[in-house]
Structures are given as structure tokens and as C-alpha cells.
Amino acid sequence: MIKLKDLLVERIDYQDTAKMLVKHYGLRSKVKFGRVKGSNEADYDWVKDIINLKRSYPNVKEFIVSVLHEIDHAKMRKKMGARKYEHEYVMAGEEAEQKGGDFHDDNKYEEQAEQWAQDEYRRKWKQKFR
């Protein structure tokens, strides 16, 4: 039987793991759980530099890939600056809509972040988080 204490320990491990990954990539982004907008696995608030994650994930791989995806957004924000990143992201979303796609799902920055997260997980983290 699963005890409440075991569930709390798992959440703390997720929190620590997410913070460790953020630090590993040289970022200062904050990590918060339970504030994800819509049906996304996670989201990144580039104004406040906060990575928001769901409270639970079906498996560790989805959790790590979600964190890595948002880390890629944070890296782009750090590289471009908050204003330029927001401008470029919105322009890419509008371009996707003009082509008949979705602002978020067909955004080139979302596709790039997802590809980087999948590649980075396979290349670097898969063996460490089994």
C-alpha cells in the first residue's frame, strides 16, 4: 500500500531533480509544481523565468523530457533576452497560424525545444534515470 509519506518523498525527488537539471545547464530559473496552463506537460513563464511542472507524471522519462523541454526555452530566453525571445516566439506562432497550424503546437520554437529535449534525454540522461 502506498503511504502519504512515500508520495511526498517522490515529489521532493522530482523537485530536487528538476532543480539539479536547471543548475546543470547554467540557469537560474525557478521550478514550481502544479501551475501548468492548459493540457501541457509543463510550461515556461519567460517573464518571471519560472518553469511550471505538473504535480505528477506517468513515468520518469516524461518528467525529464518535460523539464528539458522547458530548459531549452529558458536557454533561448537567456541567449536572446526576454523581450526579443517573446517577440520571436510570438512571430513564429503567428506564422504557424497563417500556415493553418496551431500557435503553440506548430511553433518552430516548440518543435525545436521538443527535439532538443528528446535528443538530450537519449544522449545524456537516459542511463542516469532508469
Spans of model-derived segments:
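Catalytic zinc-binding patch centered on the HExxH motif and its immediate surroundings
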Residues: K23-G26, K30-N52, Y57-K61
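Short helix/loop segments within enzyme catalytic domains
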Residues: F103, A117-R130
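Proteolytic processing junctions in secreted/extracellular precursors
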Residues: L4-R11
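Short active-site segment of divalent metal-dependent hydrolases/proteases
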Residues: L68-M76
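Post-HEXXH active-site segment of zinc metalloproteases
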Residues: K61-V65, R77-E111, Q115
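Zn2+-dependent metallopeptidase catalytic core
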Residues: R11-S29
